[in-house]
Amino acid sequence: MRSSNLTTTVHFLSPVFAAFFPSHGTEQEDAPIVRVKTAKGRKISSTNWIRRQVNDQYVSLAKKEGYRSRSAYKLIEINDKFKILQRGRFVLDLGSSPGGWAQVASKNTAIIDSTEPTVVAVDIQSMKDIHNVSFVQCDIDSDHDLLNEKLSGRKFDVVLSDMAPKSCGHRQVDHANIINLCELARDIALEYLNPNGSFVTKLLHGEYEQEFRRSIMTHFGVVSYFKPKSSRKDSSEIYLVALKFKG
């Protein structure tokens, strides 16, 4: 992303900012922004978040089927459409906590009768164990040497990123912030993907979108946008799916 007149040039994965930026399930699923108190003392946005969670079929379905976040169904839809997760493929999941995408990736790629994990999940926050998933806790922005050490030079068939900064409510700033994360995920994908591999990242439409997409098209044979039905109706998120990595 080229510099602009927006005053938001920070690295959003550094520890000092970690508490403010969720990983997977970023449509305010886990921690609502609270602003104004009602007469009963409850924040209005908090009340709206609770109501939305209670009425959300994917929240209920995730609990029923054992997924850690409703965002798992977004990856399920992406995979139904693009078939990126297949038995024996190796997956790198960036910003994995709490683990919804890692669960889906594991289910679709696990090798029968093998003890080798097919999924490596990475997050600055901790994450509970998942079968067939190796977890690395580090800051993928500032701890690149540690990430290299943990990955031990291995390559992946799929790199996933559902990372997004928590919304500040300003469309241009939110867009600039998420593009910064998209570029970080892209750079990791370019380093760790196998030839013909796939890359998926969340983004928001905006000023830097086309520039980012062009940077992806340089390295991939097929680049598509996809909006899962499980995305909330009021969410402006969309997923960029890049296939056939050329190196």
Swiss-Prot record:
Gene encoding the protein: rlmE
Function: Specifically methylates the uridine in position 2552 of 23S rRNA at the 2'-O position of the ribose in the fully assembled 50S ribosomal subunit.
HAMAP family (UniProt xref): RNA_methyltr_E (MF_01547)
Catalytic residues in the record: 202 (proton acceptor)
InterPro entries on file: RNA_methyltr_RlmE (IPR050082), RNA_MeTrfase_FtsJ_dom (IPR002877), rRNA-MeTfrase_E (IPR015507), SAM-dependent_MTases_sf (IPR029063)
Reaction it catalyzes: uridine(2552) in 23S rRNA + S-adenosyl-L-methionine = 2'-O-methyluridine(2552) in 23S rRNA + S-adenosyl-L-homocysteine + H(+)
GO cellular component, one term: cytoplasm
Subcellular location: Cytoplasm
GO molecular function, one term: rRNA (uridine-2'-O-)-methyltransferase activity
Family to which the UniProt record says this protein belongs: Belongs to the class I-like SAM-binding methyltransferase superfamily. RNA methyltransferase RlmE family.
Binding site for S-adenosyl-L-methionine: 99, 101, 123, 139, 162
Keyword rRNA processing: yes
One Pfam family in the UniProt entry: FtsJ
The keyword rRNA processing belongs to this UniProt entry's keyword annotation: yes
Designated name of the protein: Ribosomal RNA large subunit methyltransferase E
Keywords per UniProt: Cytoplasm, Methyltransferase, rRNA processing, S-adenosyl-L-methionine, Transferase
EC number, UniProt record: 2.1.1.166
